[in-house]
C-alpha cells in the first residue's frame, strides 16, 4: 500500500475542500442576498453545484478509467484553482449561478477520481483508507465554513457587506485552490497512478465501463444505501436548526453545536469503522448504520431539550459513520480495478441525488404533515431500504473486507 500517496491525497483534499467550503457556506448565500436574491433563488445558488455533480461525476470517473487518474485529477484541481477568479467579475445573480455551476465541476471531477486512486492503492485496507480520505475532507469543510463567516464579519458584517467583502473572501478561495493544485501537481507527477486502459476505442471503453458498473445491482444497492442515508442527513442539516430554535426553544449557538456534534462524531468514527469493516465485513455495518440513523431521526421531533437532542445527533453521526465507512469500500470490492473510477462516479452521483433530495423531500413533508410525521416517514425509508440491500447483496461472491 502506498501510504505516501494516500497522505498526499489527503493533504490535497483538505486544501481543496477548505477552499470549496470557504466559497459556499455562509458566504455564498450572503453573496446571493447582496445581489438581491430571494429565499428560493438563494436555494438554487447553493444547490446548483450539486446538480453538476449529479450529471458529471459518473462520466468523470469513467473517463479516468480510460485516460488515467493523473490527468483527470489535475483537470478537477484546475477547477478548484481557476474558477474562483470568476467570482471577481460577478455583478448579477444569474452570473453567480453560472459560476457556481462551473465551480461544481471541481468536486464532480476530483472527488470520485481521488477515491478511485485510494481504492487502487489501499489493497485490503480500502475501508480504512477511504474513510481517512473522507474524514480529512470533512475536516477541511468544517474549517472552511466558519473561516468564511469570520471573514465576512471582520470585513463589515452582513449589513455592511460590499462587493469588496466578497472579492476578498473569494481571493482567499482562489489562493487555497491554487495551493491544492500545486501540491497535486507535485504529488501526481512524482507518484504512479492508474494509467487507464489501452484496448479498444475510447468511446467503446467509456460506454462499456458505465454499462458494466451501473448494470451491477450490487453496486447500485451499495450506493443507494449511501444515497438514502444522505437523504436523511440532508433533511437533518436543513431542518434540525429550524426545529431546535423554533420548536425546542434553543439558541442559534446551541443549534450549531447539535450539527457540530453530529459531524465531529462521523469524522472521528469513520476511520475506526472503516478499519473494522476491512476485517469483519461491510454489509452488517451498513445495516447497523441505517438502523442507527433511523431511530434517533424518528425520535428528534419528540425531544425538546439540548441534552437529548445532542445525544440523538451523536447517535445519528455514529450511524452515518457506519454506513459511509463501508459503502464506498464495498463498491470498490464489487468492481474490477479497471472500473474503480466509474464505480466511484456512480457512487458519487447517487450520493449527490440523496443529499440534494433530502431538504426538498423533507421540506414538502414538514410543510404538509409537520415534523413528527415527516421525520417518521423518512426514518421508515431508511428501515425499508434494509431488506432491499440484503436481497441485492445475497450471494455477491465477494469476500467482504478482503477484496
List where the protein language model places each region.
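Helix-loop-helix hairpin linking two adjacent transmembrane segments in secondary transporters
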Residues: 133-185, 372
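Juxtamembrane intracellular "pre-TM" segments in multi-pass secondary transporters
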Residues: 1-3, 189-222
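C-terminal membrane-cytosol helix-exit motif in multi-pass small-molecule transporters
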Residues: 174-195, 385-393
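Structural signature of the two symmetry-related core transmembrane helices
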Residues: 71-85, 284-299
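Paired small-residue
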Residues: 94-102, 296, 307-315
Amino acid at each position: 500500500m502506498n501510504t505516501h500517496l494516500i497522505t498526499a491525497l489527503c493533504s490535497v483534499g483538505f486544501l481543496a475542500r477548505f477552499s470549496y467550503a470557504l466559497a459556499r457556506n455562509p458566504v455564498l448565500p450572503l453573496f446571493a442576498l447582496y445581489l438581491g436574491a430571494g429565499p428560493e433563488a438563494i436555494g438554487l445558488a447553493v444547490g446548483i453545484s450539486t446538480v453538476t455533480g449529479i450529471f458529471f461525476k459518473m462520466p468523470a470517473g469513467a473517463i479516468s478509467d480510460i485516460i488515467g487518474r493523473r490527468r483527470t485529477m489535475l483537470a478537477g484541481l484546475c477547477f478548484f484553482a481557476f474558477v474562483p477568479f470568476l467570482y471577481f467579475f460577478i455583478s448579477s445573480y444569474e452570473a453567480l449561478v453560472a459560476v457556481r455551476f462551473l465551480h461544481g465541476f471541481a468536486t464532480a471531477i476530483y472527488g470520485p477520481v481521488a477515491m478511485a486512486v485510494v481504492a487502487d492503492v489501499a489493497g485490503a485496507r480500502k475501508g480504512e483508507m477511504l474513510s481517512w480520505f473522507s474524514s480529512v475532507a470533512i475536516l477541511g469543510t468544517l474549517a472552511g465554513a466558519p473561516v468564511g463567516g469570520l471573514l465576512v464579519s471582520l470585513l463589515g458584517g452582513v449589513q455592511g457587506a460590499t462587493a469588496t467583502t466578497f472579492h476578498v473572501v473569494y481571493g482567499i478561495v482562489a489562493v487555497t485552490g491554487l495551493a491544492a493544485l500545486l501540491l497535486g501537481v507535485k504529488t501526481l507527477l512524482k507518484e504512479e497512478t492508474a494509467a487507464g486502459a489501452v484496448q479498444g476505442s475510447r468511446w467503446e471503453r467509456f460506454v462499456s465501463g458505465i454499462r458494466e458498473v451501473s448494470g451491477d445491482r450490487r453496486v447500485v444497492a451499495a450506493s443507494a444505501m449511501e444515497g438514502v442515508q444522505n437523504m436523511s442527513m440532508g433533511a437533518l442539516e436543513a431542518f434540525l436548526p429550524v426545529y431546535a430554535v423554533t420548536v425546542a426553544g434553543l439558541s442559534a449557538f446551541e443549534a450549531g453545536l447539535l450539527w457540530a456534534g453530529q459531524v465531529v462524531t462521523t469524522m472521528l468514527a469513520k476511520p475506526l469503522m472503516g478499519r473494522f469493516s476491512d476485517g469483519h465485513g461491510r454489509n452488517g455495518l451498513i445495516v447497523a448504520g441505517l438502523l442507527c440513523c433511523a431511530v434517533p431521526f424518528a425520535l428528534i421531533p419528540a425531544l425538546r431539550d439540548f441534552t437529548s437532542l445532542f445525544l440523538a445527533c451523536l447517535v445519528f453521526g455514529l450511524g452515518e459513520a457506519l454506513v459511509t465507512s463501508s459503502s464506498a469500500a464495498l463498491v470498490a470490492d464489487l468492481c474490477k480495478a479497471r472500473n474503480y473510477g466509474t464505480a466511484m462516479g456512480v457512487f458519487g452521483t447517487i450520493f449527490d441525488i440523496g443529499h440534494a433530495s433530502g431538504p426538498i423531500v423533507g421540506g414538502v413533508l414538514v410543510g404538509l404533515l409537520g415534523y413528527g410525521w415527516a421525520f417518521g416517514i423518512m426514518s421508515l425509508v431508511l428501515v425499508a431500504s434494509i431488506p432491499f440491500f440484503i436481497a441485492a447483496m445475497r450471494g455477491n461472491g465477494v469476500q467482504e473486507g478482503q477484496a
